[in-house]
Curated annotation (Swiss-Prot):
C-type lectin domain residues: 134-245
SMART domains per the UniProt record, alphabetical: CLECT
Signal peptide: 1-20
Domain of life per record: Eukaryota
Subcellular location: Secreted
Protein name per the record: Mannose-binding protein C
C-alpha cells in the first residue's frame, strides 16, 4: 500500500479513539463522584469484636406462656430467736364446777391423807414392844434406858409424849408394863417444888412414894415411876426406861 494512502487511515483511527475516550469520560462523570474513584466492591472482612455490655434494662412483663408447676418445698431454715412475751390476755370467765361422781375430790384426798398418816403412826408403834391400853391412851416402851431429854425426843419422833398417868388406872397400867424405873412426863424445872406435865398444866393426880419429892442435892427435877408404882424425883440427866403414850 502507498504511504500516502495509509496516512489518512491512521488519522481516522486516532480521531475515532479520541472521540471514544471523550464520550466514556463524560459518562463516567455522570455516574461516579469526582472525589471517590469508582471500582468493583471488595471482599467482606472478618466480624469485629463484641462491644461492651449495655446498662441493665427494666424488668419486662411476664410472658404469655403457661405457668410452670410449683417446685418441691425447700429445707427448713434454722429456728429464729424467741420473740418477746406478749401482754397478758383478758381474764376469762369463771367456769362451771366440774362433775364429781365419786363425791368431793378434796374430801376424798383429805381422808386418804389422814389414813396414810394413821397407817404411818401404826407402823411406828410396831417398832415398840406390845404396850398396854387404858381408856384413850396406849402406853408403849422400846425397852431402852436414856436421859429425860432423849425420852422426850424419842416420843416426839413418833408423835407421842412421855407417859403421864392422870389417874390410878393409868398409873397401874404403866406399872404392869415396865419392870424397872421409867421416866414420867412430869417436872418442876420451871418452878422448884411445883410439878407440872409437859404442857405446863398442874397435876390433878399424884402417887408420890413416902418421903418424896425431896429434891436431893437440889438437882432432882424429873420424876420416875418405881416398881412399886410410887413416884420419886430424880435428876433429869440420869438414865431410866423410856415409855411413851399415844392417843387412840
Amino acid at each position: 500500500m502507498s504511504p500516502f494512502l495509509s496516512l489518512p487511515l491512521l488519522l481516522l483511527s486516532v480521531l475515532s479513539a479520541s472521540y471514544s475516550e471523550t464520550v466514556t469520560s463524560e459518562d463516567a462523570q455522570k455516574t461516579c463522584p469526582t472525589v471517590i474513584a469508582c471500582s468493583s466492591p471488595g471482599i467482606n472482612g472478618f466480624p469485629g469484636k463484641d462491644g461492651r455490655d449495655g446498662t441493665k434494662g427494666e424488668k419486662g412483663e411476664p410472658g404469655q406462656g403457661l405457668r410452670g408447676l410449683q417446685g418441691p418445698p425447700g429445707k427448713l431454715g434454722p429456728p429464729g430467736n424467741p420473740g418477746p412475751s406478749g401482754s397478758p390476755g383478758a381474764k376469762g370467765q369463771k367456769g362451771d364446777p366440774g362433775a364429781s361422781p365419786d363425791g368431793d375430790s378434796s374430801l376424798a384426798a383429805s381422808e386418804r391423807k389422814a389414813l396414810q398418816t394413821e397407817m404411818a403412826r401404826i407402823k411406828k408403834w410396831v417398832t415398840f414392844s406390845l404396850g398396854k391400853q387404858v381408856g384413850k391412851k396406849l402406853f408403849l416402851s422400846n425397852g431402852e434406858t436414856m436421859t429425860f431429854d432423849k425420852v422426850k425426843a424419842l416420843c416426839a419422833q413418833f408423835q407421842a409424849s412421855v407417859a403421864t398417868p392422870m389417874n390410878q388406872a393409868e398409873n397401874t397400867v404403866i406399872q404392869n408394863l415396865v419392870k424397872e424405873e421409867a421416866f414420867l412426863g412430869i417436872t418442876d424445872e420451871e418452878t422448884e417444888g411445883q410439878f407440872v406435865d409437859l404442857t405446863g398444866r398442874r397435876l390433878t393426880y399424884t402417887n408420890w412414894n413416902q418421903g418424896e419429892p425431896n429434891n436431893a442435892d437440889s438437882r432432882e427435877d424429873c420424876v420416875v415411876l418405881l416398881r412399886s408404882g410410887g413416884w420419886n424425883d430424880v435428876p433429869c440427866s440420869s438414865s431410866h426406861l423410856a415409855i411413851c403414850e399415844f392417843p387412840v
